[in-house]
């Protein structure tokens, strides 16, 4: 089997392709590397100016080494093998969007550190309990959530009460699974 691509190798390919220095760049795309990236290694800490980092469609198992990314606002980790949200604390004060759909996340422990998070795409993961879902209510800025394809959503959508139950538990949401949320008091006023 081919050896995994390291972040360092992916960055040097990216630099060759774009002609930009990774340490200066605001947006870096390292998605779908062949062979795939398996580890978020220490080379990431050189990306001091990066605001948007895409590592989607690789084989990453753990979120790590984000401490040098002082300006990171958008992190794309969709279609990897990530099982939990540990490692996000390093970007808890800056991250506004986390795209982490199509992984193996069951528990949302550690999400509370994301104090600026506005957008969370966490569809097609393994979250099955309300006890995990309610942790999203701890995010003071969260307004757009895509949660479709998690066992919890599938069960309640089949019962016809998903949007009602989800927005009751995370009342600040403005958009759920791509649909604008209309609050009952807004309905009564119209």
Curated annotation (Swiss-Prot):
LRR repeats: 47-69, 70-93, 95-114, 115-138
Pfam family membership, one: LRR_4
Residue numbers carrying Phosphoserine: 56
An annotated Gene Ontology molecular function: alpha-tubulin binding
Protein's GO biological process: outer dynein arm assembly
Family annotation (Gene3D superfamilies): Ribonuclease Inhibitor
Localization, UniProt: Cytoplasm, Cytoskeleton, Cilium axoneme
Main location per the UniProt record: cytoplasm
PROSITE patterns reported in the protein's UniProt record: LRR
Post-translational modification N-acetylalanine, affected residues: 2
GO CC field: cell projection; cytoplasm; dynein complex; microtubule
Keywords: Acetylation, Cell projection, Cytoplasm, Cytoskeleton, Dynein, Leucine-rich repeat, Microtubule, Motor protein, Phosphoprotein, Repeat
Segments forming a coiled coil: none
Assembly: Interacts with ZMYND10 (via C-terminus). Interacts with DNAH5, a outer arm dynein heavy chain. Interacts with tubulin located within the A-tubule of the outer doublets in a ATP-independent manner.
Miscellaneous field: Outer (ODAs) and inner (IDAs) dynein arms contain the molecular motors that generate the force to move cilia by ATP-dependent reactions. There are two mechanosensory systems that monitor and respond to the mechanical state (curvature) of the axoneme. One system involves the central pair microtubule complex and radial spokes and the second system involves the outer dynein arms.
Function noted in UniProt: Part of the multisubunit axonemal ATPase complexes that generate the force for cilia motility and govern beat frequency. Component of the outer arm dynein (ODA). May be involved in a mechanosensory feedback mechanism controlling ODA activity based on external conformational cues by tethering the outer arm dynein heavy chain (DNAH5) to the microtubule within the axoneme. Important for ciliary function in the airways and for the function of the cilia that produce the nodal flow essential for the determination of the left-right asymmetry.
PANTHER family: DYNEIN AXONEMAL LIGHT CHAIN 1, NISCHARIN RELATED
Record family assignment: Belongs to the dynein light chain LC1-type family.
Official protein name in the record: Dynein axonemal light chain 1
Organism: Rattus norvegicus
């Amino acid at each position: 089997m081919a050896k995994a691509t390291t972040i360092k190798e992916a960055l040097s390919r990216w630099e060759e392709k774009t002609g930009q220095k990774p340490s200066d760049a605001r947006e870096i795309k390292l998605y779908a590397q062949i062979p795939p990236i398996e580890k978020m290694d220490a080379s990431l800490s050189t990306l001091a100016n990066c605001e948007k980092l895409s590592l989607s469609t690789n084989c990453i198992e753990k979120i790590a080494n984000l401490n040098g990314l002082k300006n990171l606002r958008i992190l794309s980790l969709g279609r990897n093998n990530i099982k939990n949200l540990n490692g996000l604390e390093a970007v808890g004060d800056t991250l506004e969007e986390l795209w982490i759909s199509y992984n193996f996340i069951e528990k949302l422990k550690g999400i509370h550190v994301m104090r600026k998070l506005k957008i969370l795409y966490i569809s097609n993961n393994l979250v099955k309990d309300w006890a995990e879902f309610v942790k999203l209510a701890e995010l003071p800025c969260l307004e757009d959530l895509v949660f479709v394809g998690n066992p919890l959503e599938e069960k309640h959508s089949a019962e016809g009460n998903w949007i009602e139950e989800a927005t009751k538990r995370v009342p600040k949401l403005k958009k759920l699974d791509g649909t604008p949320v209309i609050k009952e008091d807004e309905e009564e006023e119209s």
